[in-house]
Amino acid sequence: MSEKLSAKQYAEQLLYKPEYAADKQPDVKEKAAAFAEGYKNFLDHAKTEREAAATSEQMLLAAGYKPFEPKKTYAPGEKIYFIQEHKAVVAATIGQKPFEEGFRLVIAHIDSPRLDLRPNPLYESDHLSYFKTHYYGGIRKYQWGTMPLAIHGVFTRADGSSMSFSVGEDENDPVFCITDRLPHLGAEQNDRKLSDGIKAEELNVLIGSDAVEEEDVKEAVKLNTLILLHEKYGITERDFTRAEIEVVPAHKARDVGFDRSMVGGYGHDDRVDAYPALVAEIETKDPMHTTVCVLTDKEEIGSDGVTGMQSMYVFHFLQLLCRAAGQDDIIAFQNSVCLSADVTAAYDPSWAGAFEPKNGTYAGRGVAFFKYTGSRGKSSASDANAELVGDITRLLDANNVAWQIGELGRLDLGGGGTIAKYVANRGIPVLDIGVPVLSMHSPFEVIHKTDLYMAYRTFSLFCQAEQ
């Protein structure tokens, strides 16, 4: 007859005690800090989805990846990639097993909430020149006032040539800003709802104040600004109508905290998952299953468009691989597994009322899983099977990877979604995973280095797994 355990012994055996990964594994701090240095560099060079795609392509080419050829048959170990319309990346390492035994996909997104210039953005008012903007994604508009801003983009000229540019990132560059009311005259604004603290039509970027010297010239400040742009970039006002220009925070990624345990910066959502997913794919050697890393676009506005996951570009790539090898893509999809790599909210003690503590995810406890996302009654969610959650978490447990699982926040306050459902719609089982973020969708988000590192380890193990 077995000896009866004490309550304390039962507690040790049965209860789940969340732990902070760096506290439990001291060596993790050093490894996480080293990995974060590469990530910060990536973040600084990838302020827009175009820049993220271009930076990723440079990394892939340096690692020996070759451009994808649709009708070519590839051998195990070969590394291929393609760029979708300058804004999305697909990279793959051919596995030892046939495609019909399934792909292993990790999908993150590289677009972030921001301000876009309107088609006719340039105007003058009271001897000041401005750009009109149209916000992209779920920003809190009041957060974008009175901070240094940079302008990144591409012009397509009338002759068909194009030119990329960036102003505001170099120390010697000028910066730009959105002005706000002074508190002395803020009584009316103070009565606004928070969401209207700065309204969409007030998100106007200040870009100049000097006028041309000649008299009797209409809109002399606007003209002077345009002359400066023409002298440097060779563009006219009409060229704005065929441009893609984005306004982003001008600051660089920085360590946060006296202990430097965190990283603050713009664009963690979702480049904090995109970077480790890409590095894991690059480092993958001779996998059993073909691994596919996708850095997609347009997630922040519903994944629509030719570069979003509601498009077929990823699935066409997989189908073309199968067809060139004489294999059935439907069978391949049925045997595939996907990790939808997107950030989640980190529990914030300063805003505790937004969270349900027992089911929150915490900065420093490791990579976070979500069996489902959606809002309210799981609306628009992809709900992963328990078996898939078990398979992935067992892999991590066997390799001492810190992970946690939870929900976005309190029910009925709102919600959120990912690209998971668009992959699931193709018959591919998918599980949401990502790094918890403080101040998500703000111009300066914060993540814990340990969680970033654990995401990298998770993606690496997933790519190299035999099953």
What are these regions (language model features)?
Residues 1-467:
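N-terminal hydrophobic/helix-forming segments and targeting peptides
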